[in-house]
């Protein structure tokens, strides 16, 4: 346990992504992060308490894509509540998670149908050869619809995506391909 690494005057600073917005917005690329846990502010703070850590200060910073929760904590001899949170107190989190999981197949079909329709109009280029693109291509099984993966990072150009064996091109290729 982390609280055993500190004396009673020591502090730990945690900074974690707030998964709430991503779940509510059906962002299915979120699991690429491979965290063991995906927290809302409430579940994060409860987890700290259950692990014998007292919150000195906390805040949430809102960003356009993913919000960040941070907390400065210190060891506590008193754990406010050793019991798990009652399910009834997590209605919002559970409802959001259920919708997130139930909507995936619908969203996947919508994405595939969109790419199938657009592919008939001509080649498709995906901008960005990062983890989000890999997740997007993989989770929605759309590699067969992607003709070009473009990225301005010179260290990526000429390499291949780990999904679909798609070569990564400099965005300038669009000028040549018209």
Model-assigned labels for residue ranges:
Residues 14-17, 58, 127-129:
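Generic beta-strand/beta-sheet core signal
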């Amino acid at each position: 346990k982390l609280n055993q690494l500190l004396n009673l005057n020591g502090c730990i600073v945690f900074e974690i992504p707030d998964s709430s917005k991503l779940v509510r917005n059906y962002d299915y690329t979120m699991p690429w992060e491979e965290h063991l846990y995906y927290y809302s502010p409430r579940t994060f703070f409860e987890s700290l308490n259950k692990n014998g850590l007292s919150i000195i200060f906390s805040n949430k910073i809102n960003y356009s894509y993913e919000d960040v929760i941070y907390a400065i904590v210190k060891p506590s001899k008193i754990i406010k509540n050793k019991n798990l949170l009652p399910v009834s107190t997590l209605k919002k989190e559970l409802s959001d998670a259920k919708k997130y999981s139930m909507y995936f197949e619908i969203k996947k079909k919508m994405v595939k149908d969109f790419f199938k329709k657009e592919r008939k109009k001509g080649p498709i280029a995906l901008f960005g050869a990062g983890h989000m693109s890999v997740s997007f291509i993989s989770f929605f099984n759309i590699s067969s619809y992607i003709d070009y993966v473009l990225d301005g990072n010179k260290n990526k150009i000429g390499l291949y995506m780990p999904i679909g064996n798609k070569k990564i091109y400099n965005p300038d290729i669009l000028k040549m391909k018209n």
